[in-house]
Amino acid sequence: MESIGDDDELRSKTVSLPRRISFTILLLLLLISLSTRVSGSLDKSGRRVIEARTGQDLIWVVQLSDLHFSVHHPERAIDFKNIVGPALALINPSLVLITGDLTDGKSKDMLTMKLNEDEWLEYESVMQDVVKRSGLNKSIFYDLRGNHDNFGVPSVGSSVDFFSKYSINGQMGRKGNVNTITVETSERKHLFVGIDTTMHIGLRGPTNLFGHPTDELLSSLDSHLSQWDNQSAKPVAKISFGHFPLSFTALSHSQKSLKDVFLKHSISAYLCGHLHSRFGKNLKRHHHSGGISLSDNDLFQLNMRQSGAESTSNCSFGALPAAEFWEWEMGDWRKNRAMRIMAIDRGHVSYVDLDFKSKPQKTIILPTFPLDSRFMSTSFARHKYECQHMISSSYDAIRAIVFSHSLVVEVVARVYDSSPGFDNLVMEAPMRKHGGDSSSSGATFFSLPWNYRAFEDPLPDRFWLQIEVTDIKGRLTLSEMRPFSINGLSSKVSWTWNEFRVMGCQWAALYYPILWPALYSLFLVFLIPKCIIIVFKKQYTLKKFIAKKGPITLVLWILQDLCRMPVVWFGYMAYLFYLIFFPWFSGEVFADSGDRAYMTIMGWVVTSSGADRKHEYIGQPDVMVVVIPHVVFVVIPSVLVVCCLVAEREIYKDHIRTVSGKKEDDHDRGRKKRSQRRSLLFSNRRLFRKSVLLASLALYWKHFKNCWALGRAYEMNVVHFPGYSLVVPLLLLYVICKTHKVP
């Protein structure tokens, strides 16, 4: 009996074992599936894939930038908490991208720049609240490091690297400089690649202004952007996002750029921040592989679109449209409370910028097709039109997303023909809602079938689209009027001067082209007249200038008089050599380390933390914010002031001789008349000299402010930068005293 019982027990254990294994496997599969639904799949390289929740070939994301949370301005964080959480709950995006400058890192007087942990604690707390109030998964938030988040950080992972500790990326374990997430619909993959191009050794400001992509980062970016090229049967829309615009991004060590990689992959757009809204609303730039820039080195781009960017498409078999992408800088949260919603609808990229500072956003309208002809990727659109590759399903309807706190009862699309006037309405019709509960608010997709070929026209801004939304409370909301072009032609938009200054100038490449001509010009100012005196034995004097007037004679006379003041001539020559070959000052560039580095025109010389403890230059071209203003707005003006003082002394001396009758020549009536004409400026009152002295006082004040700001920024006093701070004021003072009395 015992043996029979043992057999039954053994049989029951044998039967139950496969059931347990099967149950365990099913449980694991269920957990994996649940995890994938919540946060997407994650491969070993940190490349996530999530499924879009829209049910259509349509996604939208939110971008925020330049939050600048500050202990001195608590309203920034308070407004962010009160506004952004509910807004995200309404918008319900697939991703939330925060493109840098999460905290401010500045003292109250804005001169000392290093990270403040209290600001990071506030950022962490606010983001936790925003995630909770939005109802979104924390994993869809991507925040990037900006230059303000890197002030005084000697290395990633150091004790003052608060970004790695308190940011969402840091807490989610996203440690690389390149992070990728793919949002997938049934028809398309949408690849988003975030890049951190901040300095690998973070200096304090103000010499921490530019993005610094390394060759390793560019190689990694290239790899991430190409991850689906040979693996997906679906088309791929590519978007990159970072903090720095390309105009404030340096080249890598091998002289490669982000622009090269972006054009190689013909991404749709590069989203960035950094510049803020104070420079203008059109901080956008179109990059095109076939465009013509002002110079071979791409130092300038005069217009938002490059010249020659709209060539005829090549429609031969297998030919692709010319590589292009848009660079879209967005406004800041710091002062303007800006937010951007960007949508990709069947491959068409559009966006709307929101301003939460001026008015509450009860209803938001984002037209997704037709695209705004001012900011569309025209090579792609024109290639499809001219080569008849247009997919009718993506062109056959006007489409828009409406985000509303209240129930939307009517959406009307209107098309205006601007050729006879701006009020010629040529189409007006209600749009039809797609999906969702008819009694619900939130994000809703609307469309209106139309005959798009009726709007083909060689003018890119003839037809304009506007959408009107009426909610259940009777509130009317109008979208911004925007031109569109079915033909894929671009409508021209011009930069203002400020917009061109920050977007059209490649500042990293302009550093040396500005610096060296300025320094060479100063050398020539002092060397040419000296050589004329020594080598050619020619003397230029006031008497010679009066006899033979001309700009060259005038300049040579003044400069030769300057050469006859040896203290001034040798002083400036020595100072110019000092500026080129010697350190300008020694300051604390890292937060709370106490270690000092010294700055030259080539960058900051710091001692690396590696075993070899080698010295390396960092912060080039960032040091241009110190070097260029000093050379152009202090040294050069001081030379002009000195020349004016020297010239005034000679003219006044001539005036005194004429009036007193002690001139060596005969008393010439013509000279006396000229002396009388000059008497007002060069009489005993010496009004011209006084005006020059006022200019020198303004120069003193500017130089003092620069010295004060640098002293506060890098914890320096006069001992740490005597050459930078004292030479120009002392030379000016010497000339003022020397030219005061006329023998």
Curated annotation (Swiss-Prot):
Single annotated GO MF: metal ion binding
The keyword RNA-binding is assigned to this record: no
Cofactor requirement: a divalent metal cation
Stretch forming the signal peptide: 1-40
Membrane topology of this protein: Multi-pass membrane protein
Top enzyme category: hydrolase
Entry keywords, A to Z: Hydrolase, Membrane, Metal-binding, Signal, Transmembrane, Transmembrane helix
Record family assignment: Belongs to the metallophosphoesterase superfamily.
Protein name: Putative metallophosphoesterase At3g03305
Organism name: Arabidopsis thaliana
